[in-house]
Amino acid sequence: MLKVRSALSLIQSQKATLSLATQKRWQTNVATAEAREDSEWLQAKPFEQIPRLNMWALSMKMSMPGGKYKNMELMEMFEAMRQDYGDIFFMPGIMGNPPFLSTHNPQDFEVVFRNEGVWPNRPGNYTLLYHREEYRKDFYQGVMGVIPTQGKPWGDFRTVVNPVLMQPKNVRLYYKKMSQVNQEFVQRILELRDPDTLEAPDDFIDTINRWTLESVSVVALDKQLGLLKNSNKESEALKLFHYLDEFFIVSIDLEMKPSPWRYIKTPKLKRLMRALDGIQEVTLAYVDEAIERLDKEAKEGVVRPENEQSVLEKLLKVDRKVATVMAMDMLMAGVDTTSSTFTALLLCLAKNPEKQARLREEVMKVLPNKNSEFTEASMKNVPYLRACIKESQRLHPLIVGNARVLARDAVLSGYRVPAGTYVNIVPLNALTRDEYFPQASEFLPERWLRSPKDSESKCPANELKSTNPFVFLPFGFGPRMCVGKRIVEMELELGTARLIRNFNVEFNYPTENAFRSALINLPNIPLKFKFIDLPN
């Protein structure tokens, strides 16, 4: 009964999701709250003195032929702006995008996160909100999910899905299924690599994407899609694969660059709406398939204890719409992101064979044989594997940064910044500075290990550790931390361990410009990894 009440409350709340105009009014209301009169605030410089970019000059630089920023990747552009305007500057809104403050100063990061409020407002994903709130409102009926929503509707949705997705015991159900996916991934590599050079083909990223989509689908859709097998070339799964790819390719131009899509239905907006329609259609079909399967089991008297019920099954018990929208959010947020993170990790390990060798020593204890099964107990003791993943995320960050709308007045870099201000937190420069990470240019997983003398501590205790914990937050911070964090971590850990147990991995090509910026960083070079077989 409690679950039913929660679902009804959620649906009512989500149906009240803020429209774009309403969100702006909410931000204005927040900006008038809790005026500060303390000494820090009074001694700070006025907000108006923050370096500012002229709207027309910025538009020219970003979009006109010969403009300084026109042909730059997103991360390159933000670094160029930092060099031009300093560690903190104010950017005007262009073509309907809100104006925002951009800070590269790590001292500001904690201040922003500590002033994010009860329901943190994370700007962005306006095209996805448009699709769910306006374009296909008849389907979503106010249930918008976790990605594009703000305020209480977002908080209510997270309250329902958090107990299912963030509980370690629920994620552990997928060890065996993900192990099967990883076995198929290894077999696919054996089939695809050149028999003479042992190198993967130029388009190996396609195989990595198939592996990540297959892995996420095990959780989101309670189903293996068969994407790592040749027999599914024309399947619905392959359609989903291409729709997700299209979503990431097109979104960057509408979300991050000047575009009149809010005023006229541009070709790219129509293209994105078709991709989102496709994701919705295929996901709904798979959810309906799961419902039929569960109904059939119920008629046959099959009853599983709660600790054996899948994530999708538990969400369906809350509400079908909630389960469907959450599945879509997991697919959109969990495929290209994991693929890019995994690619960065493989490149780091391939270019640092001594680190790969140390990792293999640890993995051999978990997987004595190539086909050994993962166990919950053995995967509790893989600190170097987790350290390798973290260090690769530091060297190859997935996104430019994070963003929040201040819920309270704050002082950033010595300036008064009023509540309601959009703030973009950009740690790119700090992630590779010795000031924050000693020997920052090197791949040193050891910086994330706890020293034996400090084994009870939650933080690294050695000379390589970060000097500011708010510089490196790959899964975000606070209530808006990635809801799929545990699933992604398990996917990366199991996939990497299986690959390193089966192969010695080399990459005998340059890695300059290995990634390009879209909504996230995406691989930009042929991933011709060399996979050398290891003895069983």
From Swiss-Prot:
Signal peptide: none annotated. The keyword Oxidoreductase applies. It is an enzyme of class 1 (oxidoreductase). Expression in third-instar larvae is detected in the midgut and Malpighian tubules of both lufenuron-resistant and wild-type strains, higher expression level is seen in lufenuron-resistant strains. It holds the Pfam family p450. Keywords: Heme, Iron, Membrane, Metal-binding, Mitochondrion, Monooxygenase, Oxidoreductase, Transit peptide. GO terms for molecular function: heme binding; iron ion binding; monooxygenase activity; oxidoreductase activity, acting on paired donors, with incorporation or reduction of molecular oxygen. GO terms for cellular component: mitochondrial membrane; mitochondrion. GO terms for biological process: response to insecticide. Transmembrane segments: none annotated. Its cofactor is heme. Changing V417A: In strain: Subline 8. It comes from the Eukaryota. It is found in: Mitochondrion membrane. Has a role in resistance to insecticide lufenuron, but no other insecticides. Bari1 transposable element insertion in the 3' end of the gene leads to ten-fold more abundant expression than in flies lacking the insert. This is Probable cytochrome P450 12a4, mitochondrial. It comes from Drosophila melanogaster. The gene is Cyp12a4.
